[in-house]
A protein has these predicted regions:
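N-terminal acidic, glycine/proline-rich low-complexity segments
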Residues: 34-341
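Bacterial Sec-dependent N-terminal signal peptides
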Residues: 1-37, 341
Length: 341
């Protein structure tokens, strides 16, 4: 029987078996597709919380294994020093020349209350000293995207939607004759975001710039996969890292060493929201998660609701045991620099 005829026959005669087979093929396709090197723009608030540091560590670990190519690391906040923090971490992982961007316009300025950013800037080498030393975030997005193959770039955003909204609203420039939405449609394969609480709720990354999140979820032209608050809340990481005596002079270890003891709720490790977005963005969602397709709707107050069915959005649902995902993330967060420039 012809392959397509077989599927049509199966869909009519045995709908349940057809659905299971379809899910199997989707998972296989996702896993196969993710075997290639994934070109990534990493967009992070890098400051109010410290799971961003775990996330960028995963990013560099995947890059060292050939699974990711880091095109840029971009801040969605603009507290003074955020560019330097990115520079510290990129330099530590032997990628000091990865482009860094910071928003020039209106943006959140909230930073870490534990002051681990000050420790990194005072104790580790970095080339970037001031936010003014790096390009505007939107300009850098346009420059990087314009130079990439069509439908190739994965944007992993683990902060606010400030930059993505600005990118959508950007006008043609010296890098591309396309406006922002056209450029995204042409160059971006998908967005994977740590954002929202599902099926409904209020979550920090959306709430802090709700207007930007509304614009992105209403008008972004390519698929968006969300790792919601409920996913990372259950995954605790960082203790194996800070107890590993073999890891010395590590900014990543210092961040978790400083921060975990300062909050009783972190006694078993820090909740790991941002790391899950990097895992899905580069390794794929299977076998760790399944996808719930539909549409994210953001209210004016930053709360989100979910409309199941057709839509360009999806949120992840646990598939693998949480403990196994936790062990994987803890292992990746102990990754040491292995690539020399």
């Amino acid at each position: 029987m012809h392959f397509l005829n077989f599927f049509n026959h199966l869909a009519i005669k045995n709908p349940m078996r057809f659905k299971l087979l379809l899910v199997f093929f989707m998972i296989c396709h996702t896993c196969f597709a993710q075997q290639k090197t994934v070109p990534v723009i990493f967009d992070s608030d890098m400051g109010p919380d410290y799971d961003d540091v775990g996330a960028i560590t995963l990013l560099h670990a995947f890059a060292d294994s050939g699974k990711a190519k880091i095109l840029a690391t971009i801040a969605s906040t603009k507290f003074e020093g955020v560019a330097g923090v990115f520079s510290v971490l990129n330099t530590y992982f032997n990628r000091p020349d990865v482009p860094i961007g910071v928003p020039r316009g209106k943006a959140v300025t909230q930073r870490d209350w534990q002051h681990w950013t000050d420790t990194l800037l005072a104790n580790y080498p970095h080339q970037v000293m001031r936010n003014e030393d790096v390009p505007d975030a939107t300009e850098l997005y346009r420059k990087i995207l314009a130079a990439q193959p069509d439908k190739s770039v994965t944007i992993i955003t683990v902060g606010f939607f400030t930059n993505l909204a600005s990118l959508l609203q950007s006008r043609p420039d010296k890098y591309s004759k396309l406006n922002g939405r056209q450029l995204v449609q042409k160059k971006v394969k998908r967005v994977v975001s740590m954002a929202g609480k599902f099926p409904s709720g209020k979550e920090f990354n959306i709430e802090k710039d709700a207007a930007a999140a509304q614009l992105v979820f209403k008008t972004w032209p390519t698929p968006i996969i969300c790792s919601g608050f409920e996913i990372g809340e259950k995954i605790k990481t960082g203790l194996p890292l800070i107890h590993n005596a073999a890891i010395q002079n590590s900014p990543v270890k210092d961040v978790f060493r400083i921060s975990i003891p300062m909050d009783k709720q972190d006694s078993a490790g820090r909740m790991s929201w941002d790391e899950t977005a990097v895992l899905v963005g580069i390794a794929g969602y299977g076998p760790y998660y399944t996808l719930k397709p539909g549409k994210v709707v953001v209210a004016d107050d930053g709360s989100n609701t979910w409309v199941s069915g057709k839509g360009n959005h999806a949120y992840i649902v646990p598939r693998m045991e949480i403990q196994k995902v936790q062990e994987l993330l803890n292992d990746l967060m102990m990754h040491q620099p292995s690539r020399k420039e």
